[in-house]
């Protein structure tokens, strides 16, 4: 994980002060009162102190303070959660030592499930995307199979995004600048179009030059750079008080040259130079469409969660990190890895949960 110097500039859109985020209570006069964090670990909103499970919730303030941009930045931030890196672009979750058995199999389901707003994300490559307009993140220690399905033996990571509201036009923009020409722009705006319909637009754009040169590739070729963007539109329709529909459409693109892997037999001793002649690159595209319908009965809540997800990944890298002549002399040949992976998934889930004091099974 790369650490870079940075400066951040923020502004609020719409000329209004943002209200406290969902799940974070406004400051009170009593120093003995704890802030309230609302979690959905059991598929229903409840205070984290009342949730009967091992759960860690990270509100947006904590994510900003620790510069959490993506899943890899959670490593070391949550007890018992470990983020492993495979080939520089794929990140594997494990909780309490239980996780992905084969990190090289990018399409295999892990033992720690990933969800966004309660919707299952079947492809572990989704972890390579940036966290976009996040309200809070919940980490539930396993087993969680009863609530989240067979892929949650180790636990579950649930990313809760900021939802549209009807109260006001509001938003934010952050610009982060850093070393290696880092430019990171995050922005979001909430637009209430009527008393029953509102949308929220969000975007995350990041560019940073690589810090290692592949000296034998023609031109100024740097490894481990970043050229990513991630956009989302979320719409809320609530014609009556006890019924709502939330739909979202998002697209993300991750482009980077192959990760730096300095071979101990590299004749160039400069750690910022790699004697490689292979112009490796990784390119990931993901499109996600979701629809969540919620109806509140007097004693129970019914929810339908639907999604269509498509991901395409392509790329290649040099296993040796050397030129072909050097690799041939040392190993008898070069080993270049090529990746082409496509994943298409349709998910559908129905939840029926009782309210406090309501009927139970």
What are the language-model segments listed below?
Residues 66, 90, 111, 154, ...:
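Transmembrane beta-barrel architecture of outer-membrane proteins
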Residues 44, 89, 178-180, 206-210, ...:
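Structural signature of outer-membrane beta-barrel domains
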Residues 1-66, 72-80, 190, 241, ...:
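N-terminal Sec signal peptide and the immediately downstream disordered periplasmic leader
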Residues 244, 248-286, 337-341:
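Flexible loop and strand-edge segments within Gram-negative outer membrane beta-barrel domains
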Residues 247-250, 284-315, 336-361:
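Face-selective signature of the C-terminal outer-membrane beta-barrel domain
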Residues 217-222, 252, 261-271, 309, ...:
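Flexible, surface-exposed loop regions and adjacent strand-edge segments
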Residues 32-166:
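Acidic, small-polar-rich N-terminal luminal/periplasmic segments of exported/outer-membrane proteins
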């Amino acid at each position: 994980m790369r650490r870079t110097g940075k400066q951040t500039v923020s502004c609020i859109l719409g000329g209004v002060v943002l209200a406290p985020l969902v799940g974070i209570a406004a400051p009170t006069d009593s120093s003995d009162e704890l802030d309230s964090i609302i979690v959905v670990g059991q598929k229903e909103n409840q205070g984290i102190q009342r949730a009967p499970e091992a759960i860690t919730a990270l509100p947006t303030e904590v994510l900003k303070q620790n510069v959490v941009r993506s899943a890899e930045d959670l490593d070391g931030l949550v007890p018992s959660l470990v983020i492993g890196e495979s080939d520089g672009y794929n990140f594997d979750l494990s909780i309490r030592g239980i996780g992905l058995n084969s990190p090289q199999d990018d399409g295999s389901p892990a033992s720690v499930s990933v969800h966004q707003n309660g919707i299952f994300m079947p492809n572990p490559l989704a972890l390579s995307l940036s966290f976009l307009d996040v309200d809070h993140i919940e980490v539930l220690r396993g087993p969680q199979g009863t609530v989240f399905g067979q892929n949650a033996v180790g636990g579950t990571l649930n990313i809760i995004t900021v939802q549209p509201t009807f109260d006001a036009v509001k938003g934010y923009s952050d610009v982060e600048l850093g070393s290696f020409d880092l430019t990171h722009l995050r922005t979001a705006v909430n637009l209430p179009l009527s008393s029953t319909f509102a949308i929220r637009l969000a975007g995350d754009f990041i560019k940073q030059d690589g810090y290692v040169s592949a000296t034998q590739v023609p031109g100024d070729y740097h490894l481990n750079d970043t050229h990513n963007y991630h956009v989302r539109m979320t719409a809320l329709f609530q014609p009556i008080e006890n019924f709502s529909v939330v739909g979202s459409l998002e697209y993300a693109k991750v482009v980077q040259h192959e990760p730096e892997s300095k071979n101990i037999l590299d004749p160039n001793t400069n750690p910022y130079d790699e004697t490689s002649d292979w112009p490796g690159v990784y390119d990931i595209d993901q499109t996600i469409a979701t629809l969540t319908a919620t109806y509140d009965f007097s004693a129970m809540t019914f929810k339908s969660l639907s999604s269509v997800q498509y991901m395409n990944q392509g790329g290649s890298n040099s296993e040796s990190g050397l030129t072909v002549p050097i690799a041939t002399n040392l190993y008898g040949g070069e080993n270049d890895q090529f990746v082409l992976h496509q994943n298409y998934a349709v998910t559908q889930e129905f939840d029926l949960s009782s309210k406090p004091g309501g009927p139970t099974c």
